[in-house]
């Protein structure tokens, strides 16, 4: 075990998979000589060369399309979006080709492609660089969505994503790259469709993912001091959801709070709330509560940015409302 930053764990995952499979190739802006904006691809250009680590023009629609075409011919392509907000420029390729080609070709083609990069609300990156695209991509048929949250699961999940035959949107939060934790030095993979029980509890199920995992953990420390016993589940797989793990927790606690950084309208919490009501209605003491960001562009101002997303105090207040029947 070695203590590593999350960006280093991602770098290790890519390096190991490129060494394991010579069909793995990287595409993206400044991923070669520069090593990527957040150094996830550092040293890979020198090790594997320009034919496998490809610096692209600033043309997201074109290089995502090229990566899809390469995947159709047998390569495994890992595409970095310098910022996930820019990937919106490739939405046609992602929706019409990356997600659906396997089905529309009758299974003739597999599209082994991982679309990864920084997203989420950062420190004063402005509205255009604070996009949360998991909501947009929820409706794309054939596309899996995975959100890493620790150095350990970042490495194991990315390795699994690269080995998958399916197209995967791999979400990395911009504020988690410098998170440090122990990472095994050996080769390991983690299941892409399995949630993680971060803390076991009996009073309420709190479902969350990515950066909000840490806001929830901080809130639960306060709640435990007040005598509450919440269960925390990191969803990890945002499409499909690990409905088995979620369901077992709900059948134990009978109460649910969903915490996300995304906006509620069209957000992850809306979809998950519907699934919970459809599958576990009789197990609930009250309706699942969704705690999401307001439907506004992310402000550049630091203080305004802070109030534009869910804070620890909001989580504490929501849990107490649910557990005291004051919803």
From Swiss-Prot:
Protein name, per record: Pyruvate dehydrogenase E1 component subunit beta
GO cellular component, one term: chloroplast
Subcellular locations according to the entry: Plastid, Chloroplast
Binding site for thiamine diphosphate: 60
Annotated EC: 1.2.4.1
Subunit and interaction comment: Heterodimer of an alpha and a beta chain.
Reaction catalyzed: N(6)-[(R)-lipoyl]-L-lysyl-[protein] + pyruvate + H(+) = N(6)-[(R)-S(8)-acetyldihydrolipoyl]-L-lysyl-[protein] + CO2
Sequence positions that bind K(+): 113, 161-162, 166
Gene Ontology molecular-function annotations: metal ion binding; pyruvate dehydrogenase (acetyl-transferring) activity
Described purpose of this protein according to its UniProt entry: The pyruvate dehydrogenase complex catalyzes the overall conversion of pyruvate to acetyl-CoA and CO(2). It contains multiple copies of three enzymatic components: pyruvate dehydrogenase (E1), dihydrolipoamide acetyltransferase (E2) and lipoamide dehydrogenase (E3).
Cofactor(s) needed by this chain: thiamine diphosphate
Signal peptide limits: none
Keywords from the UniProt entry: Chloroplast, Metal-binding, Oxidoreductase, Plastid, Potassium, Pyruvate, Thiamine pyrophosphate
Organism: Mesostigma viride (Green alga)
Enzyme class: oxidoreductase
InterPro entries, alphabetized: THDP-binding, Transketo_C/PFOR_II, Transketolase-like_Pyr-bd, Transketolase_C
UniProt xrefs under SMART domains: Transket_pyr (SM00861)
